[in-house]
């Protein structure tokens, strides 16, 4: 058990960093100090008390990265309720499912997202609040939440007649063993799994960040990864807030142009990112330089190449704000070309490894200790083993145990049993090896999950289940080709024949329409690039499961 209490980390931080800047929404003038964040949390606690919210009740949050997203999260966990973050690009039906499956009482959401949700599909909610200003967007019949919110100033004066000061912060010290977070691994109805994360799991990640001094008091960080994603949440937000860092929240799509401008203005001391983002920056900032004829010539001259690499390194560091200690990349495999070039120019980057079920960190090494090809070193609060006769040389499933490992999947005992070994180790589903020093080398992924370039988990069966319900699709199989999803489809030729539609032109029209409709039903990171027709039924196991490994290398038509 981690000795530091997760809730007390934030009580202490608010008191110690009272006047320091805490959260700023990028592009806006308003900044919340740590003291102001604590006061906003106190207001939400009064709301919860007024509504007789119980410890252990669930509260969902969905929206872009904003100060109030962070405040709603911290208000929930410091009250003793369980927070349920939802990725903002999930489809409405998936949001409905998660809110209902988690049995959420309240929902904090962006106004535009709320407009696309259906009230009747969320009948279990007592109230919905805006992440713009915390006003009540909806209340269930018989509730008086809106009236209370309008009189919040009076409630604060009544409870804090002398004003709200750091001495008023006194959160109940909830046991680290308590579940504080439900993080859903997927948004699709029927397949989503709510990962039960305890205070101990969260404290394990945050205190690791504190011990290794990833961030310090008074430093700056730019939060652009989705806060509903375990990686960005743990370090850009939770660790940063625990140590007194100033967090600027980028509530926009992190295109290279927007990021470059934000990095220049914020000048972060640490950058947490995924391969897709850093590869785009490489493509936009570095490739135009090194592809010049004069540059290619110069890089082939001994001694001169080192000088040029140093200049390129400086240009890249300056483009990212110029003040960061290192760039930590996680969530997916890096493009080898980019990795090799970064090593050549001695760029301060490292690659970590984790998963939602570990909240998320499993392995990490600072950039000056990082071994190329590895995914970092197993944390000192975790253990790793490889399900292999020779874990140093023969690939096997990576299995872990330790402080960061989840309690299980919410209301899904079967999935929980399947993901743990009989002796209690978490089966990551990743294949790899380790070395004598505890560095992990990931060789691939087991089963069927595909990891998108921005770190999102893609479950092919979920997309296939939607596609298989579309006109004239008998079977389908989602594969990855050149980092894009392709759907192999065996058409229902019998039905096409019976309707006199079995011509290449008609089949193309039908499948084009299916592709268009399919991409409306899945998340942005699950978009299918094309449908490729397959001439026969797919080969199956005795259990009638498709033998996926036979089709992963199917080439383009």
What residues fall within each predicted segment?
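Conserved pre-ATP/AMP-binding loop-to-beta segment of ANL
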Residues: 18-19, 149-184, 191, 214-220
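Conserved AMP-binding/adenylation subdomain of ANL enzymes
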Residues: 203-220, 227-314, 323, 348
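Conserved AMP-binding/adenylate-forming core of the ANL superfamily
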Residues: 22-66, 70, 74, 91-96, ...
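Conserved AMP-binding A3 loop
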Residues: 33-35, 171, 180-206
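Conserved C-terminal "lid"/linker of ANL adenylate-forming enzymes
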Residues: 450, 475-486, 513-557
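AMP-dependent adenylate-forming
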Residues: 9-33, 530
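Structural core segment of the AMP-binding/adenylate-forming
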Residues: 51, 78-157, 483
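Conserved ATP-binding/catalytic segment of the ANL
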Residues: 385, 392-452
